[in-house]
Amino acid sequence: MKSMLVVTISIWLILAPTSTWAVNTIIYNVGSTTISKYATFLNDLRNEAKDPSLKCYGIPMLPNTNTNPKYVLVELQGSNKKTITLMLRRNNLYVMGYSDPFETNKCRYHIFNDISGTERQDVETTLCPNANSRVSKNINFDSRYPTLESKAGVKSRSQVQLGIQILDSNIGKISGVMSFTEKTEAEFLLVAIQMVSEAARFKYIENQVKTNFNRAFNPNPKVLNLQETWGKISTAIHDAKNGVLPKPLELVDASGAKWIVLRVDEIKPDVALLNYVGGSCQTTYNQNAMFPQLIMSTYYNYMVNLGDLFEGF
């Protein structure tokens, strides 16, 4: 009986997939792309990541931390057969690390230094399943935006240009390259995180990339503000009653002016995925009941910005 059990377990280990933690790899050919292909890539990523049973006011929500699969892989294919694979947490789309083909038939993995414990082991074995060809080159800094900005040598990521050509070029500076600086790595990560994870979370950021598809551009104040308030926006939409937020949400528009959001339909066009929030939420609401709120919101924003205008006098 014992011998049969050992044989059964051995066969299972041989036949089992290398990693049961990651969903199918989403592949995006950065080196040969179009606006339509970029949009399809982001939709594929959203569909792989979202919890199909969770939705608030028609906006899909990501799963909680206990839901399997736990991770999503995104393979970015650059020019000249250069590739980099990002590993994302499925529940929030945070980039945990990445891998690239290295030397002859080797897989080199890079992990942020704020990823620890079993998660760190998961990143290593998921990105590079074959232990015999695995090579480590750790990221010597954490994944927070302030750290990435500092390592990239800028005060704000608004100074780091985004764009398809820039992402393609940055892949070439990392993939298979023996040695590169922390600045080069941080610049690549700032661009990749915003054009993959942030664009998957926000339609507004996706549209910024599509509008500037054939040229480099600097992210505007609204882009940065959305990135920093995704959790707050998700909670506000989840807790809204008949489309009205529980309290005014103070955001920033593209020009940097205050933007006060009172209703779900004001922010909904900008949001593609909600961060996970526990508990039930409304899936739809009565549009006709929102007209008084529309008037109130217009008046509220007018008075707020009028107050800012006279503040300097």
From Swiss-Prot:
Distribution of this protein across tissues and organs:
Expressed in spring leaves (at protein level). Expressed in roots (at protein level).
Proregion positions: 286-313
Record's signal peptide: 1-22
Record carries keyword Ribosomal protein: no
Species assigned in the record? Phytolacca americana (American pokeweed)
- Which cysteines are cross-linked by disulfides? C56-C281, C107-C128
Q: What does this protein do?
A: Possesses antiviral potency. Inhibits viral infection of plants (tobacco mosaic virus). Inhibits protein synthesis. Releases both adenine and guanine from Escherichia coli rRNA in vitro. Activity on guanine is 20 times slower than that on adenine.
Pfam families assigned: RIP
Protein name, UniProt field? Antiviral protein I
